[in-house]
């Protein structure tokens, strides 16, 4: 309930213009790794395996709000655990594509019905999922990434499950 209230407050800040970013140089790879390691033990206790695919590249710091990025990573990992069904596996990865950092978070659950995919980032949209949640978290994540001049895409992964792809620019 507390998380739902926080998400509602966050979205109201976005809608009325009180939502701000505190931009600073951020080690995006370290932020993702911190989120993965924070959740890994919790997930293990729940019977969920959280894999992390680390690319060999080191990234220059990117201009971003580290607190907001942690919020996005936490929300996406939490969503993957809630909607992963009996898949009991989550994969997180980071890589460079051109001038972008690409982060993916994938679960191995049933995926999202094709007719629902265009709506999943709308506020309060919960689709046919029986999982708990407010239907706001993904909308907030999308807004945070958009304000970082990036994109957040949600789709079904080849072989099953859902995959969320974040693209953030490497430069200013």
Predicted segments with their positions:
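Short alpha-helical Gxxx[C/S/T] motif in the catalytic ATP-binding
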Residues: 137, 141
